[in-house]
Amino acid sequence: MIFLFVLSSCSTDGNHPDFEANVEKVQTFLELQGSEADPQAQLDMIHEDLEWQPAFYGTGLIGKAEFGEYLIGWQDAMEDVVYTATNYLPGVNPETGILDGSVRSYGTWTGVHSETGKSWELSSYHTWDFKDGQIVYGGDYFDAGGFLASLAPSEEE
């Protein structure tokens, strides 16, 4: 009997209490990225202490101002962008292994390259950590260099 009590007290009740709300914030953030409707609304979701890992090789962490430029750069280069999530996964604190409300997602971006008109599809992985209800840390993980090279005008064009 004591064993069952100890075993049940060690189990979790599911996700961190902030996880579902944070997933909704991430979904809104991604929809804004694709629609290009309101870059400021995206930046309002970002904490002043942001540290973001861009997808480009050799790039270190960037802060909020650089992140705004990074987002607008993608928006200027692409049209009709949609992110289709394969999943939204709960993240854990790397030091404790305990669910912390952060969000991870594998998914696929689709869209059209503004300059060449080429349609594209890109598999990716993203992370978002939160502080005070805002995104404070995260990153984009995909082959940005290879992706952009695939969109370059061909010799025939």
Predicted regions and their residues:
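Sec-dependent signal peptide recognition
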Residues: 1-2
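C-terminal motif of bacterial Sec signal peptides marking the signal peptidase cleavage site
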Residues: 5-9
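C-terminal and inter-domain tail/linker signature
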Residues: 10-157
